[in-house]
Amino acid sequence: IVPLESGVYEDAISFMILGESLQVELSDGTRTELKDTNQYIGFSGDNNNPSGILLKNNNLHLEIQIDKDHNIGMDDLAGIKDVLVESAITTIQDCDDSVAAVDAADKVIVYRNWLGLMKGDLKETFMKGDFEMTRSLNPDRTFTSKDNKELTLPGRSLMLVRNVGHLMTNSAVLDKNGNEIPEGILDAMFTICISKHDLEKTGNYSNSRKGSIYI
């Protein structure tokens, strides 16, 4: 999807940035560039020894990650350890019973998780076999653009929250007559108020690039 002018990536032994151009050295000693030079967007690291190459196809970015010390990169001629592809999808955070949120305690967990996502500080540590692992939100990715300016891309997919339909009620909040209130209204109030952290940029990261709440 981002072909070279000549040769193939399998034969690449190094990448370098010359001016506004990505140069690729091949194993036969020749040097080539992209067939469509407009697909090169930027890089990270040193221009003579970049750790990342940012490309673009159909308005979606691709990052070639380079690390010759990595257990995968050490087996590649150019040290390529991975290729990250930007996705156009959204990530749904569910308040419905598909996540078994059926009572007040469950709803508190759901809202607390949404708060952590909107503030950017949600983190979970767990054991996987003998190893302790921690999951947290990815930071934004910073590159040097082809015109030598700083370029920042989101490190996370766009998140939307799915509230419960209006036919359900929940005992988490009762009205003055002791009746359960509609769960959809409860979700709407909490998820909207929590999402203000994103709109007012009080958190670590930004979810919406358009200043919107996605429900």
Residue locations for each model-derived region?
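Catalytic alpha/beta active-site cores
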Residues: I1-Y214
